[in-house]
Each structure stands twice: as structure tokens, then as C-alpha cells.
Amino acid sequence: MIQPQTHLNVADNSGARELMCIRIIGASHRRYAHIGDVIVAVIKDAVPNMPLERSEVVRAVIVRTCKELKRDNGMIIRYDDNAAVVIDQEGNPKGTRVFGAIARELRQFNFTKIVSLAPEVL
């Protein structure tokens, strides 16, 4: 469960290392975001000499959460960290690689490009 002021790791090579959620896209007073939700975030830590810089406002899709994800078949998936992938206005990832495992549910939300870049889909 991601809410405003939550710090997330970045799971791609876009140049950002850490994000802080400032708004959840979708509803006017939505409190929490889960896997597959789009958030507005600010970059808190970035790699030097990359296109994305610190204190830049970006959109990101959540790919991993510490909070459990329960599937319809009863399987429960939990990750060790909260992570997101930086995207552009069309929903395409800004990076060319994705690190770590990605949930299968992202395919339902039309983030197929992120799923295809991921090394492991759970």
C-alpha cells in the first residue's frame, strides 16, 4: 500500500534511484495505491549525468509492494521492497531495462512493454 510521502525504489535504468509519492492518479481522494497503479512522484535520489535529475516530478507505475497481493486462486505474493518504474505520458517506460521480479497483474493494466522488459514475471 503506497500513500503520499512513501519512498520507493526505482526498478529501471532511467537515472532515478529513489522516488517519493506525492499523488495517486485515478480518483480525487484515493488513499492507497497498489501494484499497477500510476502515481505522481518526485525524484529524491538520481544517478549523475543522466536525463532525470533530483527534484524532478515524474509519473511512475508501481511494480512491487511490501503489502501482500492476493490473487483469485488464493496465492499471496509479497515483495521485499516498494518499487516503481518511471513512465512517460503514454505509459511507456523511460528506461530500457527493468530490474527485479514483476507481478503478472501489470499485463492486465496494459503495461505490456514493462512486462516484456522484466527478467522475471511472477
Curated annotation (Swiss-Prot):
CDD domains for this protein: Ribosomal_uL14
Superkingdom of origin: Eukaryota
Any one of the GO BP annotations: translation
Record Pfam families: Ribosomal_L14
Official protein name in the record: Large ribosomal subunit protein uL14c
Gene field: rpl14
Keyword annotations: Chloroplast, Plastid, Ribonucleoprotein, Ribosomal protein, RNA-binding, rRNA-binding
Family: Belongs to the universal ribosomal protein uL14 family.
